Amino acid sequence: MMNTRSNGRTHNWFGVVGLLIALLLMGSCSYSEEKAIEQSAVSFAQKYFNLHYCQALSECTPESEKWVRLKASNITQEDLDILNTQADSATCTVELVEFDGDSATTIVEVCNFLNCDSIGKPGVICPNAKFKLTLKKIGKQWKVDI
């Protein structure tokens, strides 16, 4: 007669090891996706909030281009003069990343940026604010969707 108890333990052991490997692989994929989303959000925000709008276009979806161009068209020389008096440029950090499939949402804290919220009035330097950015995965890249 054959002892099946040890054979069953072996199968259980391989099952547990297989499950652990699968969980680790899934976790690392999620981590790398989260990092890619975070990098895309920060890259866009750094360019956008430092008024490098042409460079920011490469970080957003084609549908968002018109909104970035509209924002750029409303910047005045007075706004640029205010921005140029600042010793430090705007800085951006991601506080939250949530994603599901090919879409993501981030909360980005932006510090020391020019806030231009009224047409016809000069912008003011804002010490910090939080913004929600939505991103879409296009091919293998994450792009901000305004």
Residue ranges and their predicted role:
Residues G18, L83, P122-V124:
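Residues embedded in well-ordered secondary-structure elements
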Residues G15, M26-N50:
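Short, low-complexity N-terminal intrinsically disordered segments enriched in polar/charged residues
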Residues S43, K47-L51, E59-E63, I138:
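Structured segments of extracytoplasmic/periplasmic soluble domains
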Residues M1-G27:
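Sec-dependent bacterial lipoprotein signal peptides
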Residues L96-I146:
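Exposed beta-sheet edge and beta->alpha loop/turn motif
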Residues E38-Q39, Y53-L114:
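Short solvent-exposed beta->alpha transition segments
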